[in-house]
Every structure is written in C-alpha cells, then in structure tokens.
Amino acid sequence: MNKKSTLNIIDQSYFKKYIANIRPYGFKSLVLCIIDSVFSISAVYSSTIRTLDDFVEHACIKDKHKDEYTCEEFLNNYGDFSGEELANNVFKNRQRTSTVNGILKAQAVKEYIQTFFKNGINTTKDLLSLQDETPIKTQIQRIKGQGSGITFHYVMMLAGDSNRYKRDRQIDEFFQDILGYGKLTNDELTEAFHEQLRIVNEKYPEIDNIRGLDSIIWGYMSERTVRQKQIDKCK
C-alpha cells in the first residue's frame, strides 16, 4: 500500500482554521493536565470538559487555562478523599480506566498526582524540566490502567511539550489506514508523524510542531466520524 500525504487527505480549510486560531495549548496547572489526560481516554471529550469544569468549580479555580493549581494544593484539599468520594462529589464522573477490572479514573488521577508530588514534581515547569523522564514515566505506568504510557505523553503535551502527540484510535486509523502506513509501533508512528509534519510544514510554515499536526488530524477525524454516523443513520 502506497503512503499518502496528509495534504491530499485533509482539506486546506482545516490547516487555515488552525493557523487563524493558534492560541496557548493545555493548562498552566499540572493537576488539570492530569485530569484531562486520564478522563479523556476512551471517552467522549465533551464529558471530559464537563469533568474539568466540575473540578474547577469545586476547587475555586478562576481561569482553568491560566491559573496555577499545584499537586500540593490538590493533596492538601483532596488527599484524604477516597476514589469514590472524588468520583461522586468532586469530579462527578464515575468512569473507570477499563471496563474490565479498571479502577475509577478519579482514583487514577489521585495516584498520578501523588506519584508526581513524591518525586518533587509540583508544577508543569517541574515536569518539563526533567532531564530524564523515564523513571517517573515507569512509576506512572504502574498505576492501574496507565500501563501503555499514553496518558503520560498526553500530560506532557498539555503541560507544554509541543513535540508530543496523543495516540488513540483516530490517530491510528488516520496513519495506518487512511495514509496507508499499515500497523505501526510507537516508534514507527512517531517517525511517520515527523515525516508528515515535514510535508505539511513546507506548505504551512506556521505549523511547525507535532502537537499542532495532532490537533489538525484530531479535528478532521472527529468531523469525519460525525459525518459517517449521519450517513449510517440515513441508510
């Protein structure tokens, strides 16, 4: 199967819309990065936004994108809460990390924050300043439901690392099926991302990082899924 170019698949309107609306990505608060990352896996993103907003209201955070809210603050305020209490009263979301023997995502968030804090990571700046992320990533992967490392990469993205992407079903479908790369390992997918970024960047210099391309692909695939559901409904 011949590989295709992202430029031949995604209409130019998606690229132009992204460029016109480039803005700061993610959150200043590491806690919010973790909440977004854990709750967004295998979930409709609108439910993740509601969960974030419920927490922001409960924690009295004024601006969820600009305000600092540290791991220490979370543990001071919610460290004694059980996973059940967090799920029911704070996040108002009882999703689990897996439908088979998964723990509450609320519990996973708490364990994530505890792991970061005991390793001296309190803010996004602390996380992005790590010289070697392997030890902390390994510890995070020991949390039930976090073994793949996907949420860790997404936390890094949300914290400000622009050379990350979030691997999910839509990204896999785009690269493996639509572009024709076939089944890819994590390293191979990263290489494919960089290959497509070079192609896109030649035409759109403003799009110069993996995170930006990930956002464009995600937007395209989300709308494609909606259109397909509408077509299926009319059959």
Model features per residue range: what roles?
Residues 64-68, 74-80, 116-122, 162-167:
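Short, exposed beta-strand "edge-strand" segments with a Pro/Gly-rich flavor and a Y/T-containing core
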Residues 39-47, 60, 117, 163, ...:
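Short alpha-helix boundary/capping elements
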Residues 1-101:
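Structure-specific DNA junction-binding interface
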